């Protein structure tokens, strides 16, 4: 499956780009499915669906807020080393600076939306 260019999805769904200087050409979404990476963010990567768009909602976000900087660095580095098409933070949740730094190092685009995870997922499925 060829997929859809991320630039098209960003424009169509009015996503906020969190890493402004990241080039999006060549980044494609090949699967219409998404993944909520709660288990991966807690360290469990068996059966990880890395080819899916990764959606960070309130559950994932509040879990990350309970980690110290060393724990965050470890999990962000591990999570973002995979060939992820992009990560989207829902409900206007803001990724922290360390997350953005690790994403940039691994060339993983990070976006935001004011929509809830359910509404974003529904809108995205329509576009893909």
Mark where each language-model region is.
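Gly/Thr-rich phosphate-binding loop signature of adenosyl cofactor/nucleotide-binding cores
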Residues: 1-80
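Structural motif
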Residues: 52-55, 85-88, 108-111
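Fold-independent oxyanion-binding glycine-rich loops
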Residues: 57-59, 91-92, 114
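A generic secondary-structure micro-motif detector
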Residues: 65, 88-90
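Residue-level recognition of alpha-helix initiation/capping sites
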Residues: 70, 92-94
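Short, surface-exposed connector motifs at secondary-structure boundaries
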Residues: 79-85, 104-107
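Charged, amphipathic alpha-helical linker segments immediately N-terminal to NTP-binding catalytic cores
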Residues: 94-119
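Conserved small/polar residues in nucleotide/adenosyl-binding loops
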Residues: 120-128
